[in-house]
Each structure stands twice: as C-alpha cells, then as structure tokens.
C-alpha cells in the first residue's frame, strides 16, 4: 500500500471519528442546559478510537511519519502531514517528535507555526496581496520563484478598520471570516491618529506576561456582561515607531520596532525565543476574545503608547539599553532587555541619484513603503549625505531580519527569518501600509 493510500484511509477514518464525537456531544446537550454546561467544562466526552490506524506499532508509525515528512516537504502535499497529526493522540505525539518547528526545519506545517520563529539558517519567503475594495490584506507562503504567478499557500489575513482616533488591523487565520468574534483571530495592530505609532497585540501569552514590566500588562474584560466566563486577554508584544523621513520621498521611512516578546539575547550564540507553544495544533481561542478587549479612548494611553513619546535616538543601545530615554539597570538589562529593530540605512546610488537598498531581486518597484529591518546594536546615526557615505556596519549587525517591498500593483513581498514569526513579521509589514501624516 502506498503512503498516499495510507494517508487517505487515515483521513477518512479521522472524519468518521469526528462525526461520531459530534453526535455524542449533541446528545449530551439534550440532557439540559445547566447539566450540559457542567458536562462541557468538567467532563469532556471521550472519543472512542475505533480506527485500525490508532493501534499501529510505534516502529511502523514512526517509519510512516518520517517517510511522509521527507516526501511531502512542500505545500499543497504537506497537508497530508497535518492530516496525520489529527488522527489521534498517539499520531499527534509522534508528529510532535518528528516534525520540527520552522526555526529548525524551515517549513510552516501547523497553524502554531505562524507564532514560532522563522528559520535560523534561511529565509521564509512570503508575499502579501492587497484588496483595496475591501481593505483586506492576505499573506501567502511563496511556493515558487515567480511571485506574480504564484498562488502560494494562504497563511494569514488582516482587515483594516477605521476609527475616529486610530486605525486597527484585525489579523486572522481565516481568509473569509474576518469578524471580530471569530475564534481564528490571533492578534491585531493598532495605530495612533497620525499613523506614526503602532502597537501589536497577541492573544498568546508572552514569556514576560507575569512580570511588572511594561510589556507584561494586559487588557481584560469579560466576554458577556453578567456571566462567569473566563476573561480573555490580549498582550502587547511590540511597539513600532515612524519618524520624519529625512530622505524625502526618494528614501525609505525611518522606523524602529521594540519587540517586547523577544529578548535581545535571542540573537546571541545559544540564544532562544522563550515561551514557545508545545502544541503543534492551534489552541482553540474563545470566540469572543476580540470582542472582550476594551479599546476605548482612554485605553489608547496605556503603557504601550508611552513609547510614542520616545525619540528614535532614545531607543538605542549606546551607553546602555534605554527605553524612552531611561537607561536600564543591570538587572533589567539582563532580564527584560527587548530586541530592538531599526530600518537599514540606504546607500547613495551615483547613477540613479537616489537612495537604494539591496533587496536581492525580491523588490522591483520603488516605493516609500519598502524597508529592511536589522538589529539595533548602536545608536542611530544621523542622516548620511552623498559626500559622506555610511561606513559599513559589522556583518552580524547588517543581517536583514525582515524585508518588505513592492513588486506590482497591490502585490508585495515579505521575507523574514529568526527570531521573528510570521505573525510578527506580517503585523510589522501592515504598519507600512498606513498613511503617515507626519512623516512625509
């Protein structure tokens, strides 16, 4: 029997198990509303695994998953690996052991991979399609070198919503349902009135959420008034700041990203991004997770917006890490220093008489939205002039972590790698679409 036949049989068997479990849950709800609620919270209905694939010998199961992982390396055939992880707990545990995260294997397989750091030794190439009529943005994983004809693998979507004092981008794993109440929403991006300061919110708890630092504060409200449901939270994981474009319309914008959820030590030898989810499948989110978050006018002035008063030069690493002009202590520097990203300084092109960045063929249309982000390891220097070229930075400082640029009308490429995740890179890229009233 071929591996594709095995996967097909497993998928059919898994579908019958899901239907059987659904029927059992329906019967449980018929017993009564109050009894059904207690039953749902404290006594989950077990699904009887009657499929013959659930009792395969471990050696045979390992061989099947390893062969499948090696042969189905790209999408859309990689969906068979996802199907195997959904058969039963035994298959899921085997997939967790064999299928590595994007940081190690350079592949996006499960939904949780969107929150995990990209590859260390490579680049995750993606592209974004913009639908101006609906103000919707779609992130795809590139499956080929020709971006304009590449259908890609859908990863995330974002819906732009205007408010009186700000703009919001709701980020979802669903390409069609972008309502605020869906359980596929995983975060959002919120701007100030001028479009110069942004905050990235995530529904996943960051590693420092329980600390007293600024990045650990959360927004909590109950999903429905008068109910005893568990509150849902969104966590501020990053701040983005844009400043006056000293290069005019011919150069990239000046931006800085303060990544609360990524420590600066993650770029050092042996460094890691903490608090990575153990589950390979996405945890089910509360259906009112975004409806429960308060974003009133007063909430705009929370800890996240304190970043708006800090100058670009204040958020640097010179005499010591500083945030908003305050130099961190030794203990804070050791425990809480976040990763700081800033845009790479362009070089002056004598023939074109303009500022240029080397996107290595991934960006083909000049746009003020184009940018490259690198780790900030020294104070931001003043604007270079044609007579005073910028001295080349050290190789480790010059490594591009995220680049974004235009290739056609409503088509943009987005390439990222460790320590950013697809969700974080997408949110940062979305900030470039917003109008910057005070930057140009």
Swiss-Prot record:
Domain F-box: 51-106
InterPro entries documented for this protein: F-box-like_dom_sf, F-box_dom, Tubby-like_C, Tubby_C, Tubby_C_CS
Tissue specificity remark: Ubiquitous.
Top-level taxonomic group: Eukaryota
Coiled-coil intervals, chain numbering: none
Record-linked SUPFAM superfamilies: F-box domain, Tubby C-terminal domain-like
Listed CDD domains: F-box_AtTLP-like
Family: Belongs to the TUB family.
Protein name: Tubby-like F-box protein 13
């Amino acid at each position: 029997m071929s591996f594709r036949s095995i996967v097909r049989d497993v998928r059919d068997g898994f579908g019958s198990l899901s239907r059987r479990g659904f029927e059992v849950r329906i019967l449980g709800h018929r017993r009564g509303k109050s009894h059904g609620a207690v039953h749902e919270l404290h006594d989950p209905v077990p699904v009887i695994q009657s499929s013959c694939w659930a009792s395969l010998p471990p050696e045979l199961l390992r061989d099947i998953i390893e062969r499948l992982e090696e042969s189905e390396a790209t999408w859309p055939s990689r969906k068979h690996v996802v199907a195997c992880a959904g058969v039963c707990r035994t298959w899921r545990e085997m997939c967790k052991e064999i299928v590595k995260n994007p940081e190690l294997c350079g592949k996006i397989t499960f939904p949780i991979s969107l929150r995990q750091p990209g590859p260390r030794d490579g680049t995750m190439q993606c592209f974004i399609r913009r639908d101006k009529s609906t103000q919707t943005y779609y992130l795809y994983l590139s499956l080929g070198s020709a971006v304009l004809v590449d259908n890609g693998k859908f990863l995330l979507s974002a819906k732009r919503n205007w408010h009186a004092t700000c703009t919001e981008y709701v980020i979802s794993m669903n390409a069609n349902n972008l309502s605020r109440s869906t359980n596929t929403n995983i975060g959002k991006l919120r701007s100030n009135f001028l479009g110069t300061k942004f905050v990235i919110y995530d529904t996943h708890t960051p590693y420092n959420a329980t600390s007293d630092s600024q990045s650990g504060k959360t927004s909590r409200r109950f999903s429905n008034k008068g109910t005893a449901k568990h509150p849902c939270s969104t966590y501020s994981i990053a701040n983005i700041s844009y400043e006056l474009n000293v290069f005019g319309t011919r150069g990239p914008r000046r931006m800085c990203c303060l990544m609360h959820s990524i420590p600066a030590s993650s770029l050092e030898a042996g460094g890691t991004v903490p608090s990575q989810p153990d589950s390979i499948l996405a945890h089910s989110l509360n259906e009112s997770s975004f409806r429960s978050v308060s974003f009133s006018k007063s909430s705009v002035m929370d800890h996240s917006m304190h970043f708006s008063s800090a100058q670009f030069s204040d958020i640097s690493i010179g005499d010591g890490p500083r945030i908003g002009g305050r130099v961190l202590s030794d203990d804070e520097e050791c425990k809480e220093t976040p990763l700081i990203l800033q845009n790479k300084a362009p070089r002056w092109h004598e023939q074109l008489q303009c500022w240029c960045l080397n996107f290595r063929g991934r960006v083909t249309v000049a746009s003020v939205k184009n940018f490259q982000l690198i780790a900030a390891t020294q104070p931001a220097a003043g604007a270079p002039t044609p007579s005073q070229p910028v001295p080349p930075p050290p190789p480790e400082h010059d490594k591009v972590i995220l680049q974004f640029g235009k290739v056609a009308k409503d088509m943009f490429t987005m390439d990222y790698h460790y320590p950013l995740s697809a969700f974080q890179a997408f949110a940062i890229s979305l900030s470039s679409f917003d109008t910057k009233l005070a930057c140009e």
